[in-house]
C-alpha cells in the first residue's frame, strides 16, 4: 500500500465549476504559489468532469469525440493545464493527485451519453436520468428554508435531473474509465489519483438490459427485485462495483506501485445506502491508500459524530485518513472561525490531515471575511 510522504495532508481541490483557476492564464500558477506560501502540500486538480477530460486525451478524442473540455480548449489553446499544475506544484513541493470528479456520472446531454446510450444504466421505469445528491444536500432538504433557498434547490434539481450514469458493469465503460486513469498515470509524473462519491451506482439504477441479463445469469433466470433497496440486490450491485474497483486498482498498481489511490467519499452508511459504494470493504481489501472523508457540517457536534463512525475507525487502523472540510461554495459561504474550529477538532482526534473544498472559497472574494483575514488564519493553522 502506497502512503503519503509527509505527516499531515493539507490539500485543496482545483475545480472548473464556479472557478477561473483552470481557465485564466496564470491563475493556476498564482494559486499554487499562494498555497505553497500558506504551507499547503497537496492539490487535487479536476481531470474528469461532465463527460470531458481536463488534459489532452487521445482516448477521449477516440471514444467521446473531443480531446478535452471545449471551454478549456478555447481559453487555453494548446496549453496542457494538467502539465502546468504538476510542474508548478512539484517545483514548490506540493503533491498532485488528479481528481476524477464525475466518476461514472455524466450529463444526459453530453456527447458521451449521446454517442453511447447503451453505456448508461437505467431505473426500473426505464429512465437513464438520475438525481445526484450528497449528504450536504440531503441534510439541507430536511429544512425547506426561505424563498431564496427554495429557488436554489429547484434550480439545482432541474440541473441534476439531467444527469445520467455510466453502467459500471459495461465492459466498454470499464475500458473508458480505466483507460483515462492509466493515461494520466502513464503520461504525467503524478503522485496519485483520486475518486470520490460519484464512483458508485445510485441505488435506484441497475435495471438496464445488460445488468438485468448478468443478474439473471447469476440467479437462474430470475429478474432483479423491483424494490431498489432489497438487501441482496444492493449487495450484488455493490459487489460488482467492488470488482470494478479491484480491477482498476490492480491495473494502476501494475503500471506504478507507488501511485497513491485516494478516495474522498461521503460517510459509509450514506455511500452504501444511496450509491452502493462499499468503501469499508475497499479499505479492508487494501484497494485504497488514502481516505479523505467528506464531512460537510455546520454544527460541530454533528461534525464530530462523523469522525467517530465505525467505518472511519476501521479505516484509521489500516490507512491514512484525513478529513474533507467545506471552505464554502458559491451558494454556501463558510465563516473562517468554523473552518478553524473544524481543523482543530480533526487535529485533536489525531487524523492524518485536512483538505478543503475548494480553492476559490479559501480566501477569494466568495468569502464572508476579507481575503487577508482568512489567509492570516490559515497561516496560524499551518505554520506550526
PLM features: residue spans?
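Active-site-adjacent "subsite" loops/lids of carbohydrate-active enzymes
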Residues: 6-15, 19-22, 26, 98, ...
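Acidic-and-aromatic substrate-binding clefts and catalytic sites of carbohydrate-active enzymes
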Residues: 19-26, 46-53, 75-79, 201, ...
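Short, acidic/polar
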Residues: 20-37, 173-184, 271-285, 334-347
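Aromatic- and glycine-enriched glycan-recognition loops and surfaces
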Residues: 20-38, 65-92, 175-179, 239-246
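Catalytic domains of carbohydrate-active enzymes, especially glycoside hydrolases
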Residues: 26-53, 187-192, 287-291, 348-354
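Aromatic-lined carbohydrate-binding/catalytic grooves of carbohydrate-active enzymes
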Residues: 40-77
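Glycoside hydrolase catalytic-domain groove-lining segments
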Residues: 204-206, 210-332
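Substrate-binding cleft of secreted/luminal carbohydrate-active enzymes
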Residues: 288-303, 310, 317-384
Amino acid at each position: 500500500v502506497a502512503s503519503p510522504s509527509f505527516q499531515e495532508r493539507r490539500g485543496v481541490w482545483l475545480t472548473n465549476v464556479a472557478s477561473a483557476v483552470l481557465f485564466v492564464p496564470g491563475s493556476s500558477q498564482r494559486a499554487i504559489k499562494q498555497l505553497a506560501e500558506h504551507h499547503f502540500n497537496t492539490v487535487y486538480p479536476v481531470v474528469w468532469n461532465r463527460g470531458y477530460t481536463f488534459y489532452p486525451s487521445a482516448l477521449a478524442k477516440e471514444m467521446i469525440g473531443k480531446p478535452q473540455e471545449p471551454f478549456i480548449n478555447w481559453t487555453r489553446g494548446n496549453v496542457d493545464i494538467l502539465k502546468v499544475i504538476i510542474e508548478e506544484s512539484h517545483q514548490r513541493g506540493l503533491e498532485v493527485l488528479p481528481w476524477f470528479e464525475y466518476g461514472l456520472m455524466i450529463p444526459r446531454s453530453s456527447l458521451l451519453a449521446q454517442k453511447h446510450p447503451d453505456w448508461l444504466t437505467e431505473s426500473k421505469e426505464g429512465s437513464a436520468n438520475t438525481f445526484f445528491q450528497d449528504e450536504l444536500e440531503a441534510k439541507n432538504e430536511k429544512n425547506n428554508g426561505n424563498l431564496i433557498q427554495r429557488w436554489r434547490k429547484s434550480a439545482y434539481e432541474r440541473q441534476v435531473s439531467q444527469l445520467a450514469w455510466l453502467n459500471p458493469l459495461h465492459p466498454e465503460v470499464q475500458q473508458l474509465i480505466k483507460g483515462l486513469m492509466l493515461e494520466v498515470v502513464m503520461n504525467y509524473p503524478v503522485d496519485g489519483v483520486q475518486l470520490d462519491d460519484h464512483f458508485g451506482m445510485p441505488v435506484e439504477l441497475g435495471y438496464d438490459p445488460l445488468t438485468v441479463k448478468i443478474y439473471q445469469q447469476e440467479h437462474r433466470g430470475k429478474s432483479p427485485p423491483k424494490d431498489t433497496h432489497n438487501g441482496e440486490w444492493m449487495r450484488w450491485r455493490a459487489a460488482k462495483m467492488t470488482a470494478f474497483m479491484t480491477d482498476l486498482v490492480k491495473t494502476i498498481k501494475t503500471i506504478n506501485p507507488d501511485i497513491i489511490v485516494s478516495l474522498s467519499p461521503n460517510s459509509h452508511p450514506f455511500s452504501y445506502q444511496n450509491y452502493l459504494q462499499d468503501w469499508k470493504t475497499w479499505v479492508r481489501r487494501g484497494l485504497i491508500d488514502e481516505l479523505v472523508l467528506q464531512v460537510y457540517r455546520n454544527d460541530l457536534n454533528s461534525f464530530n459524530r462523523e469522525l467517530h463512525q465505525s467505518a472511519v475507525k476501521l479505516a484509521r487502523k489500516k490507512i491514512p485518513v484525513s478529513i474533507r472540510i467545506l471552505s464554502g461554495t458559491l451558494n454556501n459561504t463558510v465563516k473562517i472561525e468554523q473552518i478553524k474550529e473544524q481543523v482543530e477538532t480533526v487535529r485533536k482526534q489525531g487524523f492524518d490531515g485536512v483538505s478543503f473544498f475548494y480553492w476559490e472559497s479559501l480566501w477569494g472574494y466568495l468569502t464572508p471575511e476579507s481575503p487577508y483575514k482568512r489567509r492570516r488564519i490559515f497561516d496560524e493553522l499551518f505554520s506550526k
